[in-house]
């Protein structure tokens, strides 16, 4: 797995904090999909790991759960606090949660663990802080995500402008030894042009590359090349994500 610079990731998401919600349709769709795997279940205490501006922290709070919101980015956590999304707030890393073991009934993490250095370590931490009989519920992105972005940039400079995500088999391997249910789903978002599609990534802070550079500055000439190379369908510009959902039952 590529070396992960947590400080750079936190900075990228911090810059996106103020406009995150208006670009977060993927996060909303993936959260809704994960919720369907928890239908009918209630949780007295919830950890929202990678809470962002707190949309799902607020969701669980409004359903009577005592919520702890955790994020690596201080501006994101401040957004959640300003919205009174949770009861408690933790500026922390999912791979090193500063909490006792067996505290929460649900550890919820929506599209955050793909930013961790080691998926098994991240899931092990979430598992550690959940009580026996509790649940770890998470989503992440897997290999094959953002093919349109990759195809368009390939026509320009043949360099990686998106992070590589783990194949399904590697995520399954990270779940070994636990009682887990998993499901995969493709999600496609549609945009009016290629620039809007790329802005959606920047708007959620997802422009940091693990290789250590931010996405290159777009010139008009480059943008024209990308626009022409982007695969279109009925005049729209798709951006496809391969979503992996996992639910781990804590023994």
Swiss-Prot record:
Top-rank taxon: Bacteria
EC identifiers of the protein: 2.1.1.197
Job of this protein: Converts the free carboxyl group of a malonyl-thioester to its methyl ester by transfer of a methyl group from S-adenosyl-L-methionine (SAM). It allows to synthesize pimeloyl-ACP via the fatty acid synthetic pathway.
Alphabetical list of InterPro entries matching this protein: BioC, Methyltransf_11, SAM-dependent_MTases_sf
GO molecular function terms attached to this record: carboxyl-O-methyltransferase activity; malonyl-CoA methyltransferase activity; methyltransferase activity; S-adenosylmethionine-dependent methyltransferase activity
Pfam family, one: Methyltransf_11
Broadest EC class assigned to this enzyme: transferase
Pathway assignment: Cofactor biosynthesis; biotin biosynthesis
The keyword Ligase belongs to this UniProt entry's keyword annotation: no
Gene3D superfamilies per record: Vaccinia Virus protein VP39 (3.40.50.150)
Known catalytic reactions: malonyl-[ACP] + S-adenosyl-L-methionine = malonyl-[ACP] methyl ester + S-adenosyl-L-homocysteine
Organism, scientific name: Salmonella typhimurium (strain LT2 / SGSC1412 / ATCC 700720)
Coiled coil location: none
One annotated GO biological process: methylation
Presence of keyword Methyltransferase: yes
Protein name: Malonyl-[acyl-carrier protein] O-methyltransferase
Record-stated family: Belongs to the methyltransferase superfamily.
Keyword terms of this UniProt record: Biotin biosynthesis, Methyltransferase, S-adenosyl-L-methionine, Transferase
